[in-house]
Amino acid sequence: MARVTVEDCLDNVDNRFQLVMVATQRSRQLARGSRDAQLPWENDKPTVMALREIAAGLVDRSILNEAVEPPAAKPRPEREFND
């Protein structure tokens, strides 16, 4: 796998500060499971996947206008209490 560089990502966002904001928002979406990845995972962490998507031009600054979604709820197993 090729390494993702800041320069690759800066072709699709205005500056480094905006890159941090966009990558943060996208990696949170991926980590929480609220959005599906647009590229194959290749055993990457959500942060690396977010940067790969930005470098590929699949994610841009419009993601900052989206609301932050809570994590996908996992059902809790019911516990039995014995008296």
From Swiss-Prot:
> What is the uppermost EC class here?
transferase
Among the entry's GO cellular component annotations, what is one?
DNA-directed RNA polymerase complex
Q: Which Pfam families match?
A: RNA_pol_Rpb6
List keywords of the entry alphabetically: DNA-directed RNA polymerase, Nucleotidyltransferase, Transcription, Transferase
Name residues in a coiled coil.
Answer: none
This enzyme catalyses:
RNA(n) + a ribonucleoside 5'-triphosphate = RNA(n+1) + diphosphate
Q: Which GO terms describe its molecular function?
A: DNA binding; DNA-directed RNA polymerase activity
Which EC numbers does the record give?
2.7.7.6
Q: Which domain of life is it from?
A: Bacteria
Report the record's Gene Ontology biological process terms.
Answer: DNA-templated transcription
InterPro entries xref list: DNA-dir_RNA_pol_omega, Pol_omega/Rpo6/RPB6, RPB6/omega-like_sf
User: What family is it from?
Assistant: Belongs to the RNA polymerase subunit omega family.
Entry-linked NCBIfam families: rpoZ (TIGR00690)
Show the PANTHER family listed in the entry. DNA-DIRECTED RNA POLYMERASE SUBUNIT OMEGA
Assembly state and interactors? The RNAP catalytic core consists of 2 alpha, 1 beta, 1 beta' and 1 omega subunit. When a sigma factor is associated with the core the holoenzyme is formed, which can initiate transcription.
Record function comment:
Promotes RNA polymerase assembly. Latches the N- and C-terminal regions of the beta' subunit thereby facilitating its interaction with the beta and alpha subunits.
**Name of the protein:** DNA-directed RNA polymerase subunit omega
Source organism per entry reads Chromohalobacter salexigens (strain ATCC BAA-138 / DSM 3043 / CIP 106854 / NCIMB 13768 / 1H11)
